[in-house]
């Protein structure tokens, strides 16, 4: 389980230009969210089976709504990738994303590049992700994981999307489904 949560407003004055602008939860600090009605809480509750061991890696959020500086993004991505690498071997991965993060150039797809790097180090294992209603999901994400975005506005169904993501991941691990995802632009 890993999370990277930020909705960037590229017009915002306050930018995320230092590590002091991030909030980090590591390891078991993610687990108290079990009964919280958000993405992570739904996933944790939905994956609660005797044969499942949850491996909480890292969740990162940001203080300001503005652009993520390249060095800050690189550091955050490295922390998540390193935590996933240390947790190997893993059977599957759950990501909690907002899906509208913008980092400085040269990064044009913050969440997608993170998912691609996770796929590179972990191999062909099932991956799912939850997203905010207005996420900008890229081909990198669609090709690498099964997305579960909010269905409602206001966004009151994060918990339900977490439950769905857990159910899907468990079914993929059990071998009962093999989802195929496509991006449809509207």
Where are these regions (language model features)?
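Short acidic (Asp/Glu) and glycine-rich catalytic loops that position anionic groups and cofactors
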Residues: 23, 144-149, 184-186
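Active-site histidine-anchored catalytic micro-motif
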Residues: 5-7, 70-77, 85-174
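Low-complexity, highly charged intrinsically disordered N-terminal segments
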Residues: 44-85
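Active-site-proximal beta-strand elements of phosphoester/diester hydrolases
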Residues: 2, 57, 149
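N-terminal amphipathic/basic leader segments beginning at the initiator methionine
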Residues: 1-49
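Internal, active-site/partner-interface "lid" segment
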Residues: 173-186
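Short, glycine/charge-rich beta-strand/loop segments that flank catalytic centers
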Residues: 59-64, 95-98, 135, 183-186
């Amino acid at each position: 389980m890993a999370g990277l949560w930020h909705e960037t407003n590229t017009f915002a004055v306050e930018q995320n230009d230092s590590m002091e602008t991030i909030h980090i939860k590591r390891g078991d600090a993610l687990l108290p969210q079990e009964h919280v009605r958000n993405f992570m809480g739904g996933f944790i509750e939905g994956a609660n089976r005797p044969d499942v061991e949850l491996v909480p890696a890292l969740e990162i959020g940001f203080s300001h709504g503005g652009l993520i500086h390249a060095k800050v993004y690189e550091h955050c991505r490295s922390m998540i990738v390193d935590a996933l690498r240390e947790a190997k071997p893993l059977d599957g991965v759950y990501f909690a994303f907002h899906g509208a993060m913008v980092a400085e150039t040269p990064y044009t797809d913050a969440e997608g590049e993170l998912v691609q790097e996770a796929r590179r180090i972990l191999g062909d294992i099932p991956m799912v992700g939850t997203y905010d209603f207005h996420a900008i999901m890229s081909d990198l994400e669609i090709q690498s994981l099964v997305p579960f975005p909010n269905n409602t506005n206001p966004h009151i169904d994060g918990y339900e999307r977490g439950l769905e993501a857990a159910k899907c991941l468990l079914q993929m691990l059990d071998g009962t489904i093999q989802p195929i995802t496509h991006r449809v632009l509207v």
